Design a protein with these regions (language model features):
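Metallocofactor- and cofactor-centric catalytic cores in central/energy metabolism, strongly enriched
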Residues: 1-224
């Protein structure tokens, strides 16, 4: 979940991110208590700290702490690939689909980004492997979405604005959209997609909701807040 939290343009809420860090550190401490020998664990697995130390620690272990530029670039490419894979898996999990092999790879690849014994060739191979699992992650999500909502079909989408109150839904979580549509039936509130949620209009299952009326907004890069 933490990887998903930090994908590009997804979360600018500092308090939420700090809370996630704190929750992760607390969970890690509970797991360490169950570990019979912590001496074999890397420093990243053992570190803990308070909020005022987070920024200092980030400067010491962040992206630029990897001095070799080639290895640094590959580590970052792998990390961004894992962020995407975690997003695919999270959305698929919401629809009760999972792939334990993908979950195991996420853990293995994350650990590898901290392994200074690996060479450039090792990271090239891991980058390619990340791409392979990324495709499998997309296949998992596609199976989850089409299994729950049918196969997308050509659809004309209204881009106008109605006169009733409305809720805009962005992102990619079709399960969230479904629950919102169910809860707003008969309330006089319309539901619109925004930005990345546009493809939801193509799924047959959503066409039965009369208050799912259209899309509002342009591409996020062209909008002003």
């Amino acid at each position: 979940m933490n990887l998903f939290t930090t994908i590009t343009n997804a979360n600018f809420d500092k308090e939420m991110i700090v809370a996630r860090i704190r929750e992760t550190l607390d969970t890690k401490e509970n797991l360490l208590k169950q570990c019979p020998d912590t001496s074999v664990l890397p420093a990243a697995a053992l570190w803990n700290g308070e909020e005022h130390t987070f920024a200092v620690k980030a400067a010491l272990v962040g992206v630029l702490s990897t001095k070799d530029e080639d290895i640094r670039s590959l580590r970052e490419m792998i990390t961004y690939g894992l962020k995407g894979l975690s997003a695919y898996s999270k959305h698929a999990n919401a629809l009760l689909k999972e792939n334990t092999e993908l979950d195991a790879f996420l853990q293995r690849a994350l650990a590898a980004t901290l392994d200074d014994s690996l060479r450039l060739e090792d990271y090239v191979n891991l980058t390619l492997e990340t791409g392979k699992y990324g495709v499998e992650g997309m296949a998992l999500l596609d199976a989850a979405n089409t299994g729950a909502y049918g196969h997308p079909e050509m659809t004309r989408v209204n881009i106008g604005v109605g006169k009733r109150p409305g809720i805009l839904v962005s992102g990619h979580d079709l399960r969230d959209l479904e629950m919102l549509l169910i809860q707003t039936q008969g309330t006089g509130v319309d539901v619109y997609t925004h930005s990345e949620m546009l493809p939801a209009h193509y799924y047959p299952a959503f066409k039965k909701y009369p208050n799912f009326v259209g899309k509002i907004g342009r591409a996020s890069c062209r909008e002003r807040v």
